[in-house]
């Protein structure tokens, strides 16, 4: 089967014909050059108004990069016509295989964008013999198209969280859909202020916001304020992973301070290399760590008492009754306040202040898993590590939408993989 026959089967453009096909270059750097010409008496499409117009003259040959075949670079060669449009004046025609002045064919751009989900942008460019900039433009095109064509209807549950993308407290606010039938990134905004989250609800619209049933977030005050105002009808659930993170942070502070004090007082370094013993869940400890932890808990140390308070708090999630869960929180907070361990007392005060929101976990009755938000954040961090960081928030947004947004793509007859 001739290559021209294959192209006419999968890449047939109305008003254009494939002419000469040449294999050029050195054996180590072969290229297929495919000459395209307009059909006789055909008219071009005006880039301004999309009307069919007569040709005015032609420009020099442009090269458009197409999907490589058998490891050989493929280029479309075409002389764009300048059109004499009654409405727009003289303009260069819009060709159907590329957008604007881009030298990548649309088919190749979609091809690169799909592979950029599996590989880093740098590796994608290297694998297909193109530039990082071409991969970036392809992903940007795919994200723009996907955001314009996605549906936001039927969203009942959302999760709000933030990630640090640069040093110096540079944050991005991320909003996810966490419904059982659909989990995806919905929106990204700069910083983590009230205005940031207002931006999401303004985009989402009042009607859709009023249909939300569950909202999951951490205890960041700006988020709490906006959610209470814009989605007051929804059950607002505090992310249990962030609550446990506050407990772990307090334990780490207690351990570090106590270890320094013991060293200054000349005691045995009992707390050396014990950080992960106290922070890990018991089921994740190695056999060696389990033995060391059993030895450590025999000592009446503040670090040990903090650890035991944290492990006792985990019993909260086993309750099925909102009433008895509230009683448990009250007793735990009272006991923690009497422990005279300042970092743990600080956490107890925070939990008391957010008790009602915490109890919404039980009102949801297992309908929502906040672990989905944490899972998405881990994927977002993995995306950033794979890219070795981002120079601008816009690059980060494009990459995260592309990876986590579950954005639609145009239907094609072939995908080349």
Residue ranges, per PLM feature:
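Short, conserved DNA-binding cores of transcription-related domains
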Residues: 1-90
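Acidic/histidine-rich catalytic cores and adjacent linkers
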Residues: 43, 48, 54, 167-169, ...
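The DNA-recognition helices of helix-turn-helix-type DNA-binding domains
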Residues: 131, 142-146, 219, 234, ...
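RNase H-like nuclease fold core
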Residues: 134, 138-216, 221-226
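Short secondary-structure boundary/capping segments
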Residues: 174-175, 229-234, 251-256
């Amino acid at each position: 089967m001739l290559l021209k026959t294959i192209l006419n089967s999968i890449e047939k453009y109305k008003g254009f014909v494939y002419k000469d096909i040449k294999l050029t270059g050195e054996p180590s750097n072969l290229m297929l050059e495919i000459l395209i010409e307009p059909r006789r008496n055909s008219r071009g499409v005006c880039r301004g108004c999309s009307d069919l117009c007569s040709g005015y003259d032609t420009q020099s040959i442009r090269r458009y990069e197409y999907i490589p075949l058998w490891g050989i670079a493929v280029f479309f060669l075409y002389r764009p016509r300048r059109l004499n449009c009654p409405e727009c004046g003289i303009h260069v025609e819009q060709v159907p295989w590329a957008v604007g002045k881009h030298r990548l064919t649309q088919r190749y751009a979609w091809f690169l964008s799909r592979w950029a989900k599996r590989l880093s942008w740098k590796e994608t460019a290297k694998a297909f013999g193109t530039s990082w900039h071409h991969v970036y433009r392809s992903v940007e095109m795919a994200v723009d198209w996907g955001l314009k064509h996605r549906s936001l209807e039927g969203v009942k549950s959302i999760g709000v969280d933030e990630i640090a993308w640069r040093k110096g407290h540079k944050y991005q606010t991320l909003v996810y859909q966490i419904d059982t039938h659909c989990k995806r990134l919905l929106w990204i905004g700069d910083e983590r202020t009230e205005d940031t989250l207002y931006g999401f609800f303004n985009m989402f619209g009042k009607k859709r916001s009023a249909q939300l049933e569950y909202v999951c977030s951490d205890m960041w005050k700006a988020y709490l304020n906006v959610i209470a105002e814009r989605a007051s009808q929804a059950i607002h659930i505090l992310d249990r992973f962030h609550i446990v993170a506050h407990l772990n942070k307090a334990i780490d502070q207690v351990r570090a301070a106590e270890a320094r004090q013991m060293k200054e007082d000349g005691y045995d370094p009992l707390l050396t290399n014990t950080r992960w013993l106290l922070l890990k869940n018991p089921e994740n400890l190695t056999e060696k760590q389990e033995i060391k932890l059993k030895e450590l808990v025999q000592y009446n140390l503040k670090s040990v008492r903090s650890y035991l308070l944290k492990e006792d708090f985990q019993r909260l999630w086993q309750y099925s009754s909102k009433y008895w869960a509230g009683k448990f929180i009250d007793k735990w907070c009272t006991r923690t306040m009497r422990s005279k361990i300042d970092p743990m007392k600080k956490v107890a005060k925070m939990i008391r202040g957010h008790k009602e929101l915490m109890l919404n976990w039980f009102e949801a009755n297992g309908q929502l898993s906040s672990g989905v938000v944490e899972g998405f954040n881990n994927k977002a961090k993995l995306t950033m590590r794979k890219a070795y960081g981002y120079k601008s928030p816009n690059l980060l947004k494009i990459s995260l939408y592309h990876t986590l947004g579950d954005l639609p793509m145009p239907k094609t007859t072939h995908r080349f993989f």
